[in-house]
UniProtKB/Swiss-Prot annotation:
Pfam families: GIDA. Catalyzes the folate-dependent formation of 5-methyl-uridine at position 54 (M-5-U54) in all tRNAs. It is an enzyme of class 2 (transferase). It comes from Paramagnetospirillum magneticum (strain ATCC 700264 / AMB-1) (Magnetospirillum magneticum). GO terms for biological process: tRNA methylation; tRNA wobble uridine modification. NCBIfam families: gid_trmFO (TIGR00137), PRK05335.1 (NF003739). This is Methylenetetrahydrofolate--tRNA-(uracil-5-)-methyltransferase TrmFO. Keywords: Cytoplasm, FAD, Flavoprotein, Methyltransferase, NAD, NADP, Transferase, tRNA processing. Its main location: cytoplasm. One of its GO terms (molecular function) is flavin adenine dinucleotide binding. Belongs to the MnmG family. TrmFO subfamily.
Length: 447
């Protein structure tokens, strides 16, 4: 009889790991602490809740590493990607989802699987000794008891960084006499984003307000915690230089204002639900106090009467030093019955977290069945990400990382004709090589 595998955490990684195990006919108990114990950032008790953005980023599998990871996960039977595709909303070349529909779809699939049992309870601390195989996917908002247990097992201090959340506004509160629909360079449908224009004077006033606005205070023990560079609060970016945002998330390139002159800067809003009634401010994650957010963001042309469905916020993320404490199949070296998955391993992003959950589920299933399982090739997105988390990164300076082509072994610099391959052609070469390597690996795990 196959032993039950316990998965702790019903976020993206835990949900994906549980699905992969169940699809391999392994009995799974999925433990989710919400609603028994809540977190500072979650709004619901749904499985696979998207806490920050509703975007899974670029879906371009030829020229973007995260788009390639999407493709590989689809080919590997990912539940998260299947539900993202089922609940996607317009977002240009990105894969964005209706967050409620997505979460409900994941939860329904897991609850309806005959090999999965969902328990709403907190696993406080070290899992019981008679749990022979455990996947810990407690996420960036790991409870204090579990964080302390991990610290004790690894012999290391918990590492942490701050992550911020962007506000969401109702579409019908936006003034379309000033704002307009358009994607940069008319990608996607050509009108997947709402754009709010600012001239130079308005932009300068906005930047000054961001810098001087009242921020959330840190606890004493949080003050030395760094931010994740890929999700900086907008006011932190503003403090780095007056025009930092004008060359970053507020750059006006690829857009034409039908309501007036060419803007100096643009605030973009991306659809947040399937109904198209909610839009989030792209790149506007913030630690401003709620009253300040309403005041400052309503100074943006087109958002003067904005109704906020959710204001931004800040939460502290916890992760372990994967290269130091994990083996090559995501097991804790100190306790091999425990396998880690998701953002707690130090990968960063929804897609990356789900991908590590997928691999943890596959590794755990193979172990439960007494089979050896090959790791995905290093030339694939799955393999490159796994290698980063489990050993290729420098342990002394290990930090959360999104998937990128810099994690892959470099392809040949010249093609078969001896011509140097660079730019977009080089990115496509990464993707072609990954596809070729993934097929035989998928065949081995399906045998």
């Amino acid at each position: 009889m196959t032993r039950t595998v316990h998965v702790i955490g019903g976020g993206l990684a835990g949900s994906e790991a549980a699905w992969q195990l169940a699809q391999a006919d392994i009995p799974v108990i999925l433990h989710e602490m919400r609603p028994v114990r809540t977190t500072p950032a979650h709004q619901t008790d749904g499985l696979a809740e998207l806490v920050c953005s509703n975007s899974l980023r670029s879906d371009d599998a030829d020229y973007n590493a995260v788009g390639l990871l999407h493709e590989e996960m689809r080919r590997a039977g990912s539940l998260i990607l299947a539900q993202a595709d089922a609940h996607k909303v317009p977002a240009g070349g990105a894969l964005a989802v209706d967050r409620d529909g997505f979460s409900q779809g994941v939860q329904a699939a897991l609850a309806g699987h005959p090999r999965i049992t969902i328990l709403r309870e907190e696993v406080a601390g070290l899992p019981p000794e008679d749990w022979e195989q455990v996947v810990i996917a407690t996420g960036p908002l790991t409870s204090p008891a579990m964080a302390e247990a991990l610290r004790g097992m690894t012999g290391e201090d918990s590492l942490a960084f701050f992550d911020a959340i962007a506000p969401i506004v109702t579409k019908d509160s936006i003034d379309f006499g000033k704002a307009w629909f358009q994607s940069r360079y008319d990608k996607g449908t050509g009108s997947d984003y709402i754009n709010c224009p600012l001239d130079r004077e308005q932009y300068n006033t906005f930047i000054d307000a961001l810098i001087t606005g009242e921020k959330v205070d840190f606890h004493e023990w949080e003050k030395d915690t760094p931010y994740f560079e890929g999700c900086l609060p907008i006011e932190v970016m503003a403090e780095r230089g007056k025009d930092t945002l004008a060359y970053g998330p507020m750059k006006p390139v690829g857009l034409t204002n039908p309501n007036g002159p060419k803007p100096f800067a643009v605030v973009q809003l991306r659809q947040d639900n399937a109904l198209g009634t909610l839009y989030n401010l792209v790149g506007f994650q913030t630690k401003l106090r709620h009253g300040e957010q309403a005041r400052i963001f309503r100074a943006i042309p087109g958002l003067e009467n904005a109704e906020f469905a959710r204001l931004g916020g800040l939460h502290r993320n916890t992760f372990i030093n994967g290269p130091r404490v994990l083996d090559r199949t995501l097991r804790l070296k100190a306790q091999p019955r425990l396998r880690l998955a998701g953002q707690v391993t130090g990968c960063e992003g929804y897609v990356e977290s789900s991908a590590i959950g997928l691999l943890a589920g596959l590794f755990a299933a193979a172990e439960a069945l007494g089979r050896d399982m090959l790791r995905p090739p290093a030339t694939t997105a799955l393999g490159a990400l796994l290698n980063h988390v489990t050993g290729d990164a420098e342990a002394e300076t290990y930090q959360p990382m999104n998937i990128n082509f810099g994690l892959f072994p470099p392809p040949p610099e010249r093609d078969e004709r001896g011509r140097r391959v660079k730019g977009r052609d080089r990115k496509k070469l990464y993707a072609q090589r990954a596809r070729e390597a993934l097929t035989p690996w998928l065949n081995t795990i399906r045998e």
